[in-house]
Amino acid sequence: MNTIIESLQQFLQYTGFANMTWQHIVMICIGIAFITVAIKKDWEPLLLVPIGFGMVIGNIPFTEGLQIGIYEQGSVMNILYQGVQKGWYPPLIFLGIGAMTDFSSLISQPRLLLIGAAAQIGIFGAYIAAIHMGFTPAESGAIGIIGGADGPTAIFLSSKLAPHLMGAIAVSAYSYMALVPVIQRPIMLMMTTKNERLIRMKTPRQVSQKEKIIFPIVGFILTALIVPSGMPLLGMLFFGNLLKESGVTKRLAETARGPMIDVVTILIGVTVGCSTQANVFLTGTSVKIFFLGLFSFVIATVCGVGFAKIMNLFCKEGNKINPLIGNAGVSAVPDAARVSQNVGRECDPNNHLLMHAMAPNVAGVIGSAVAAGIILSFLG
């Protein structure tokens, strides 16, 4: 009888219940909240469902030495996590993004590239704020990139500069990507007048197939020469776009923007979620990172809208820019552009801003990768 009781006690010591703490419960609840919001609100479900479930997986307590934890060498999750730690996954995501992206709006309206560039100021604003809050320059650079609203770029840069903060930075970046409509809309309304919101922009010109093919080649050469350290992201982005636009690599483009990006998104989401273990994630540092991420995102939106208003001072009547597209300078494609469209139609149901907003939006994708390269070249 004693042997049976001892065996039961020994078994119970191996269960998750015996090792459960309130921190584990909090993190599991946060993971479930991510899943709930993704399903009920339809906020970035392709990102939040894997991340949320990964949080649940990563916070089930277990006895050390079982070779199942994400930080235990040789475990399945640890092997999958190598793609995040060593920066393999983000370039593959950029390959898929490139194969999905139509740069026509940017090619036909190159001046809107400046709005995408202006929005990157949020990254450097958060960098300065993080320095003042006690983070090292490398940590501050990794945190600042959250303002680009680009999860893969945030993972890529944090894996190089601050791997110990990668979980908090990645979750913060993806959370704010999901909250784009909630965060940006009030800022856009506060910064624009009714007359500005009613501005109708000229229909962009048609872009030839030749221009679409030349753009990724020239774009990559120029950006890579300026910021060689951003080549892994920029190269895959423009290569993916060339696959899409060349007309002779349809199968490769479909694979890049379909099955491949879906698989990599799942792997990134689950492994990043798993990495947010209670003892690592529930700290004052994580709270600071979330605050700085929000600050960076707000500054990026303000700079994008504000710069569009400044550009209007130099634009002739009839060629004005609707400043509502300024929010789209962040890299959240196409969510930020949809916010521009929705807010614009609230004021004028017949004013379609989506095609215009896509120009600074795709410029923001390029801009965030360039900004990451600049930060990496100085701090890496």
Question: What kind of feature is each model-predicted range?
Answer:
Residues 1-72:
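N-terminal alpha-helical transmembrane segments of multi-pass membrane transport
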